[in-house]
Regions:
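RNA pseudouridine synthases
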Residues: 1-184
Length: 184
């Protein structure tokens, strides 16, 4: 949420209208679609935050990336804020924080030279998936920050979608799996 009029509408504000005590448990980049978890109260927020910190929440994203990405692999390069170019992040082996992403190609379209890929972040750095894909030469289609030609893509937004979350509900211990297919 920000002060500008375009920042006065958000998923969080919409949830607050229904659950006034709701708390944010994690975030998505503004251009990323998909699943979000909100806690109904402070105790649930604290418990969910602990699950995220302990990496006990499984997250998968679906993305369309430029080029034919390998069938599977990982990107394990440290990230840091690119201060002169905020909000951009960048790879820094000297000063960056550990960041790891697993990827698995779902399919490749030779006509468009675009791969559909499942991304699994092991860590949770800002813009991690976006920077990692660009770093290995497969930027996410429509990414205004990290794709050298973001307008080359026909969708009106970035092709990155939080499609899957799984965790043990911290208060009831019920196993929860949420799946929301990408619209692209």
């Amino acid at each position: 949420m920000g002060r500008l009029p375009e920042h006065q509408d958000s998923a969080y504000l919409r949830v607050l209208a229904i659950y006034p005590q709701a708390k944010v448990t994690h975030r998505l980049d503004m251009a990323t679609s998909g699943l979000l978890i909100f806690a109904k109260h402070r105790d649930a927020e604290v418990a969910m935050s602990k699950l995220f910190q302990a990496r006990q929440v499984t997250k998968h994203y679906i993305a369309l990336v430029q080029g034919q990405i390998p069938l599977q692999g990982s990107v394990d390069v440290p990230l840091i804020t690119d201060w002169p170019n905020r909000p951009k992040q960048m790879v820094s082996f000297e000063h960056g924080k550990t960041a790891k992403t697993l990827f698995e190609r779902i399919n490749y379209n030779a006509e468009t030279n675009i791969s559909r890929v499942k991304l699994t972040p092991i860590t949770g750095r800002s813009h991690q998936l976006r920077v990692h894909m660009a770093h290995i030469g497969h930027p996410i289609m429509g990414d205004e920050l990290y794709h050298p030609e973001p307008k080359r893509f026909t969708l009106p937004r970035m092709a990155l979608h939080a499609s899957y979350l799984a965790f043990q509900q911290p208060l009831t211990r019920q196993n929860i799996e949420l799946d929301l297919p990408a619209s692209f």
